[in-house]
Amino acid sequence: MAPHATDRSVQHLVELEHGRISREIFVNEALYQQEQEQIFARTWLFVGHESQIPKPGDYFVSCMGEESVILTRDSRQHIHVFLNTCRHGGMRVCRYDEGNTTVFTCPYHGWGYATDGRLVGVPYYKEAYREQLDRSQWGLIEVAQLANYKGTIWATWDAAAPPFLDYLGEMKLYLDTVLDCRDGREGGSEVIGGIQKWIMPCNWKFAAENFAGDAYHNISHRSVDIVGIGPSGRGRRDTDERASARRVAASFPALGHGAVSFLQLEDVPYTPSYQDTPSVEAYFKHCYEERQRRLGAGARLLGLVGTVFPTMSYLARQPRSIAVWHPRGALKTEAWRWFLVDRDAPQEVKDVLRHYAMRYSGPGGLTEQDDMENWNYASAASQGTIARRYPYNYEMGLGLPYPDYGVPGVTTERIAEQNQRGFYQRWAELMEAPSWEVLH
């Protein structure tokens, strides 16, 4: 991929030493277009989960930034991600959200593509093309790199991007808290149910930074905390093992990732959290104790939320989920949410978690409505000529020491905004860097 040319300097918009972020980066359409080239065309993006395409020919239509892509498994069980556009006339070759096929056929002129991307069907190949068309050069456009990490599928359009595990860095430990089994085994998750999708009139960065480390906004969820939405039905959204734990925020400014987790100070016995359903309670009690046995002191780290830069966020507690904030304009975001369960969990457990997810998350869930209202009104209030003259304040924790809690990242127990500042540090670097070589 050719070096990228930046359109506009953004350093004056992100003044990290003073904790100031310009409102322009959330509302300016020119900056949004610059993001498509500088960020979404270069970074690693979450596409889907391998459990969505278990059989040869299975496909799931996803997005990478603004681009529609096809996640599919070919006849040899190899996973691919292709741009969802015909190489002849540009029409989408797959118009369904998911399914199974042997050939992706363009409905415009009929070109057909195998599930490995090869162009295998061209109407009037002999009569019109005189067999001169080199079909080997006109297959579907495939991503430059693809990675399967514990069942999650990631891709990038940039061949020069670092390998995925290097891109993820030590954020891996925190991402594992949502992907690993509840009993401490590595991986083992699967997607349950369909994908929640909805549109929000706000910039994608509001949602991404919120999950990266905003522990300051819980006042927004006060009503949810008092109505008994938690798994125990006793008022809090937290499960009980987190009640006596230290809340730790971890930032990775050089990478842009951020996470908030709980760190138990000592081994804590399991306390009931699913008392309304004895079989589910027994399952999670067993998982909790097995996790302590397998991981030892490592089991004291309990995941909460995080963001892998730029747009993949997760919730590691119930309802355990992955969210992606697809950009649709400077003032428009399409949110997608996947819900995860342990693949070998009993069906009754999966059913209970599915119902809890519907009550908790998405545009009809109790907590997501609070978040969307904040992001939407912040976007609306930042568009005016006068409003744009005044930056947002991200000073919290600025200049204070960061204690070492024995876990990766720049950490603090305080409610602070170092995670958000780290997110925007990486955003500004990518917006101006001509290539990955400069960023390494």
Please place each PLM-identified region on the residue numbering.
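Rieske [2Fe-2S] iron-sulfur-binding domain
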Residues: 53-159, 163-173
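Glycine/alanine-rich phosphate-binding loops at beta-alpha junctions
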Residues: 24-25, 29-40, 44-64
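Generic structural signal for secondary-structure transition and capping sites
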Residues: 40-44, 91, 216
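Short, contiguous pre-domain boundary segments
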Residues: 8-23
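Basic/polar N-terminal segments that are highly enriched at the extreme N-terminus
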Residues: 1-12, 438-440
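Short Pro/Gly-enriched beta-strand edge/turn motifs at strand-loop
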Residues: 42-54, 124-130, 303-309
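C-terminal catalytic domain of Rieske-type non-heme iron oxygenases
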Residues: 144-147, 152-440
